């Protein structure tokens, strides 16, 4: 969807749903994930209110991360429970709306900045004390999110994800690796994970891409968690493993190292303190995270190199594909 289409849709939406006294202010495209993401403002009298709208691409089957509407009940439930996520004042589940002809959600736009750990944006502090707070708040907030009572608040939101499926679903992704050695390493890692698969506890809500780059910080403190496209119900240690993988200097290459990560043992300790329990099998989930990101890189590096989706970041990640699979195998062997 082009910017002008979104502009016309929002102008009509504001007139219909808010009133003639309100108007569309600024509008800009943002970095989305599976869908289309735009930042905009509603000017209503003396108030200027910032929002985010997410829409799916046209012609794509609505499933999983391309079903943007599924985030609406989740974010509303989390927000109502006092957790740091944006509220969703408007959402439309089906295509039969007069504004966009697509499902959409409109979220409040929270203040603050993200902390993309490999290459923080200009103006984001790299001071070790500030970075320590970014990482610490990220871990402790994860423990709070995992304590969310999904069975009470979202019992029918999502079919639980079986852990075996979380391993095998990446086969068709890593099969597209541009380098045969990557696909061979992926298959070996998949077999090792399946052969050592633990009981998937604790079980509940997971984010799916939890790291400081998907958190918002203001005045040094975490104020929001965003980008819930990959969320689901399943093994929550997926998120802890992912955070450990992001912080793990063993897999990253010079020039693409995470900025001032906490030691891995401290990440685990902070999470355990927040949950009131130290969990088994954390190393296995750390290995799974390496396998997941390396497999995702197999596809995205191919798309970048063939010119189908220009994104130089994946060349950085591509240099870590084999180290990630090797690290996963070592973690499984030692788990």
Residue ranges and their predicted role:
Residues 1-22:
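Juxta-kinase regulatory segment immediately upstream of eukaryotic protein kinase catalytic domains
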Residues 27-188, 196-202:
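ATP-binding pocket architecture of kinase catalytic cores
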Residues 203-205, 223:
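Conserved protein kinase catalytic-loop anchor
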Residues 205-207, 212:
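Catalytic-loop of the protein kinase fold
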Residues 226-231:
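Activation of the activation-loop gatekeeper triad in protein kinase-fold domains
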Residues 238-275, 289-307:
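Active-site activation/catalytic loop segments of kinase-like enzymes and analogous catalytic loops
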Residues 277, 281, 295-335:
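Helical subdomain adjoining the active site within ATP-dependent kinase catalytic cores
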